[in-house]
Swiss-Prot record:
Keywords carried by this UniProt record: Cytoplasm, Methyltransferase, Nucleotide biosynthesis, Transferase
UniProt-recorded name of the protein: Thymidylate synthase
Species for this entry: Staphylococcus aureus (strain NCTC 8325 / PS 47)
SUPFAM superfamilies: Thymidylate synthase/dCMP hydroxymethylase (SSF55831)
Source organism, top-level taxon: Bacteria
HAMAP family with a match to the protein in the record: Thymidy_synth_bact (MF_00008)
UniProt main location, coarse: cytoplasm
Length: 318
């Protein structure tokens, strides 16, 4: 048996495996892909942290709070041992004149096929992370990912140089004009795509208030179904909870709309392992603070009664 959250995710995986198109991609890994899909999660029935594999709530929450703070430097994430964005910062570093170590070209693929190189890569990454944590000057230069999510959410800059806080504006709109159809935040800024380590995959989200409940719909242009989507589901569910609390509302639905939803060819075995599992009851979320959403910390959040199958490792495509 599957709970409704795991069932929705499993249905996406099964459909892409069954009818998806075989495609090449930017990372040269290869994918099975479907264009256009939608999942719906009733947040009143629990918190959608998948149970057919362990998903780290700490990683989900600290990344989301990093976005909310408007931060774009991995130093904050590394303080919480969150390594989600390391590869993109590391890639910028090894291309710089500052880097003097062994050749790390195409480290993502080489580390998977060459054990000796993988040991070199792990050592260079370890040194890189340590310098980010201990050397603020180095972190400022090589830990920053450019104008990624947090910058666009909190400090969008228009053609005239005016700064606009999308997230704060949307929260005020929800409080004072809940029926508006303009409760939208966009991370896709076409004029700044080239300044980002990775263009935004989860591109735009919109809020909807009905009967005292806040719902959120995300449009995700590009979705790594195995590694990314479980995090994205939990992240935007958490965002919905935080903004609902900020606005004095209950939670409604999280609606997840996909553009290119894909399974990487080297994730197929891992997905099939997950699909063979049954699920546990979903956990619940507790927010143990009355702080503003802009001041809340990871320590203020708690996942209650989370039981899951073990995590399943798979390589990330950079």
């Amino acid at each position: 048996m599957l709970n409704s959250f795991d069932a929705a995710y499993h249905s996406l995986c099964e459909e892409v495996l069954e009818i998806g198109n075989t495609r090449n991609d930017r990372t040269n890994t290869g994918t099975i892909s479907k264009f256009g899909h939608q999942l719906r999660f009733d947040l009143s029935k629990g918190f959608p942290l998948l149970t057919t594999k362990k998903v780290s709530f700490k990683l989900v929450a600290t990344e989301l709070l990093w976005f909310i703070k408007g931060d774009t430097n991995i130093q904050y994430l590394l303080k919480y041992n969150n390594n989600i964005w390391n590869e993109w910062a590391f890639e910028n570093y090894i291309k710089s004149d500052e880097y003097k170590g062994p050749d790390m070209t195409d480290f993502g693929h080489r580390a998977l096929s060459d054990p000796e190189f993988n040991e070199q890569y792990k050592e260079q990454m370890k040194q890189f992370k340590q310098r980010i944590l201990e050397d603020d000057t180095f972190a400022k230069q090589f830990g920053d990912l450019g104008n990624v999510y947090g910058k666009q959410w909190r400090d969008w800059v228009d053609k005239d140089g005016n700064h606009f806080d999308q997230l704060k504006t949307v929260i005020e709109q929800i409080k004072h004009n809940p029926d508006s159809r303009r409760h939208i935040v966009s991370a896709w800024n076409p004029t700044e795509i080239d300044t980002m380590a990775l263009p935004p995959c989860h591109t735009m989200f919109q809020f909807y208030v009905q009967d005292g409940k806040l719902s959120c719909q995300l449009y995700q242009r590009s979705a790594d179904i195995f590694l990314g989507v479980p995090f994205n589901i939990a992240s935007y569910a958490l965002l919905t909870h935080l903004i609902a609390k900020e606005c004095g509302l209950e939670v409604g639905e999280f609606v997840h709309t996909f553009g290119d939803a894909h399974i990487y060819s080297n994730h197929i075995d891992a997905i099939q392992t997950q699909l063979a599992r049954e699920s546990f009851n979903p956990p619940t979320l507790k927010i143990n603070s009355d702080k503003s959403i802009f001041d809340i910390n990871y320590e203020d959040l708690e996942i209650v009664d989370y039981e899951s199958h073990p995590a399943i490792k798979a390589p990330i495509a950079v």
